[in-house]
From Swiss-Prot:
Name of the protein in question: Urease subunit gamma
Pathway this chain belongs to: Nitrogen metabolism; urea degradation; CO(2) and NH(3) from urea (urease route): step 1/1
Family classification: Belongs to the urease gamma subunit family.
HAMAP family: Urease_gamma
Organism: Lysinibacillus sphaericus (strain C3-41)
Pfam families per record: Urease_gamma (PF00547)
MF GO annotations: nickel cation binding; urease activity
Origin organism lineage: Bacteria, Bacillati, Bacillota, Bacilli, Bacillales
Domain of life: Bacteria
Subunit structure: Heterotrimer of UreA (gamma), UreB (beta) and UreC (alpha) subunits. Three heterotrimers associate to form the active enzyme.
């Protein structure tokens, strides 16, 4: 299987997001990279499912709460930006203050 660098990055982000989801399910508080990976993976999968940019920007704010992450992590993540492929082209999805 040959993947372009962009495809490799998307695959790595997906794997990191799945690992973060498993750790969250075990009751572990997520660190910064895990939190960003989980939110980013959620956005990418939502785009694949056909959701709009506006829907993803809104829904991604409910993926994690301050209780799900280690102390201070929520304050460290001011924005999450993910470039996703939608039916009408590639778009940048930006979620401001995703952990509340």
């Amino acid at each position: 299987m040959k993947l372009s660098p962009v495809e490799q990055e998307k695959l790595l982000l997906h794997v990191a997001g799945e690992l973060a989801l498993k750790r969250k399910a075990r009751g572990l508080k997520l660190n910064y990279p895990e939190a960003v990976a989980l939110i980013s993976s959620f956005i990418m999968e939502g785009a694949r499912d056909g959701k709009t940019v506006a829907q993803l920007m809104s829904e991604a704010k409910h993926v994690l709460t301050a209780e799900d992450v280690m102390e201070g992590v929520g304050d460290m993540i001011s924005d999450v930006q993910v470039e996703c492929t939608f039916p009408d082209g590639t778009k940048l999805v930006t979620v401001h203050r995703p952990i509340q």
